[in-house]
Amino acid sequence: MEWILPIAGIIAAVAFLILVIGIVVVLLSVKKNLDHVAKTLDGVEGQVQGITRESTDLLHKANRLTEDIQDKSDRLNSVVDAVKGIGDSVQTLNGSVDRVTNSITHNISQNEDKISQVVQWSNVAMEVADKWQNRRNRRDSANYKTSSVANETNHSYTTRVDNK
């Protein structure tokens, strides 16, 4: 029975050796997987840094764009207010023109007979003025002919007297 103890020791040593070899194999596999995970994380970290930079740039651009849009919106609001003011002015002007037109139409309707008489009298006055002018022109024309004939007669008389 003495031989059992050394055999048990050898079996225990072989079992321990198998256990150690199994643990080493598992640890080497875990190390390989951890190295692969570390490389993947390094790549992901680089990508995250790139994404972070791009996101920061995009945020800055978005902020500038927002400020630009706000500025343009403020300027556009002033233009809209000005156009509204112009629209109000045009509307007021249209109301004034309507009131003046209505007033003129009303006054014309009320004074239609008087206006008709004024037009008739002005036509009569223009006819009288035309006739007066025609008469004056005929009289001036007749005076010119008479004075022209008298001058010719006087000239012929003077010429005959001088010739004698």
Swiss-Prot record:
Transmembrane segments: 7-27
Biased composition (Polar residues): 143-164
InterPro entries reported for this sequence: UPF0478 (IPR009293)
Compartment list: Cell membrane
Any coiled-coil regions, as ranges: none
Family indicated by similarity: Belongs to the UPF0478 family.
PANTHER family hit by this protein: UPF0478 PROTEIN YTXG (PTHR40070:SF1)
Protein name: UPF0478 protein SSP1024
Organism for this UniProt entry: Staphylococcus saprophyticus subsp. saprophyticus (strain ATCC 15305 / DSM 20229 / NCIMB 8711 / NCTC 7292 / S-41)
